[in-house]
């Protein structure tokens, strides 16, 4: 039997559903999700393998006009995938008109000379007439290999999109073992799970000035638990107070919810300790960015 494989980038503006799509395809949380723009900061691989094929999806940070060194890193991280992949999924929302951000991405896609599939997400939010109008508008901007409307949240048409990708794969190697689902180490996934809970629980009170560093992660033979020490970094003292909460209640809730997700991922009992530290203006300091896991050479 011929084995087929390929690399597929998922590109688009912030908050269009790229991570939701990847998690649905993989059947579990690989990329964190929150209803805030620019939640994804690093490129994250989701490795989808069957007995006939391997599709390596690369979920990228939402492309936006950067205002900080972190923003520069995120946008360059997204565009750099164009040099690495066989196909691009350009994801746009069905419930928002084409904007300047979309046009900026389209110009880069035209120059990249990579086959592009337009994925119109969130079709569950619009009337079919609005969907057709959205598709026509984008169809006039560039030559797409395919146009596929989906609802990543509800799963509508997602399997059809995967089938289309499979049909267009070339014969190739199996790059990763069948049981590997991502390229990131467990520490990265743990830090992302803690960060997701911070964003979810603090809502609009904490902007994207939060990073999480896993200081240590090891099994305690006496308790038979994985002991994890993680530090939540913020830029201001006021943000530290919000995350800790009255009497430490918010930090306890963040830790409890994150621990449950980490236990599901690891298949182990976990003891999670969290601290909050202030590192002023870390998003504009390249040394801090590297320390907190935003390293161009790695991700």
From Swiss-Prot:
The keyword Cell membrane is annotated on this UniProt entry: yes
Instruction: List, for all copies, the residue spans of the domain called KH type-2.
Output: 202-280
The UniProt GO MF terms for this protein read: GTP binding; GTPase activity; ribosomal small subunit binding; small ribosomal subunit rRNA binding
Source species, domain of life? Bacteria
Location relative to the cell? Cytoplasm; Cell membrane
Gene3D superfamilies named in the record: 3.30.300.20, P-loop containing nucleotide triphosphate hydrolases (3.40.50.300)
According to the record, the residues making up region (G4) are 121-124
Q: Pfam families annotated for this entry?
A: KH_2, MMR_HSR1
Q: Name the principal localization, coarsely classed.
A: cytoplasm
Give the region (G1) as residue ranges: 12-19
How is this protein positioned relative to the membrane? Peripheral membrane protein
How it assembles, according to the record, is: Monomer.
This molecule's function is given as:
An essential GTPase that binds both GDP and GTP, with rapid nucleotide exchange. Plays a role in 16S rRNA processing and 30S ribosomal subunit biogenesis and possibly also in cell cycle regulation and energy metabolism.
Identify this protein by name: GTPase Era
Biological classification of the source:
Bacteria, Bacillati, Bacillota, Bacilli, Lactobacillales
Gene that specifies this protein: era
């Amino acid at each position: 039997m011929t084995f087929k494989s390929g690399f597929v980038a998922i590109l688009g503006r912030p908050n269009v559903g790229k991570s939701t799509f990847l998690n649905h395809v993989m059947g579990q949380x690989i990329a964190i999700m929150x209803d805030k723009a620019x939640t994804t900061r690093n490129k994250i691989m989701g490795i989808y393998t069957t007995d006939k094929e391997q599709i390596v999806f690369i979920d990228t940070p939402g492309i936006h006009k950067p205002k900080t060194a972190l923003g520069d890193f995120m946008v360059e991280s997204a565009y750099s995938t164009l040099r690495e992949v066989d196909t691009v999924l350009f994801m746009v929302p069905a419930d928002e008109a084409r904007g300047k951000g979309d046009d900026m991405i389209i110009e880069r896609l035209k120059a990249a000379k990579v086959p592009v599939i337009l994925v119109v997400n969130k079709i569950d939010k619009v009337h079919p007439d609005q969907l057709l109008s959205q598709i026509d508008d984008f169809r006039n901007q560039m030559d797409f290999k395919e146009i596929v409307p989906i609802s990543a949240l509800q799963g509508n048409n997602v399997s059809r999109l995967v089938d289309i990708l499979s049909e267009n794969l070339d014969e190739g190697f199996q790059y990763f073992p069948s049981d590997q689902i991502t390229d990131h180490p467990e520490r990265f996934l743990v830090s992302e799970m803690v960060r997701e809970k911070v964003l979810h629980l603090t809502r609009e009170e904490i902007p994207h000035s939060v990073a999480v560093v896993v200081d240590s992660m090891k099994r305690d033979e006496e308790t038979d638990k994985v002991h994890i020490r993680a530090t939540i970094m913020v830029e201001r003292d006021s943000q530290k107070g919000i995350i800790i909460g009255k009497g430490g209640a918010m930090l306890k809730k963040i830790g409890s919810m994150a621990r449950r997700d980490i236990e599901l991922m690891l298949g182990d009992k976990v003891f999670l300790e969290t601290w909050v530290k202030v590192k002023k203006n870390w998003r504009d300091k390249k040394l801090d960015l590297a320390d907190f896991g935003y390293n161009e050479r790695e991700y």
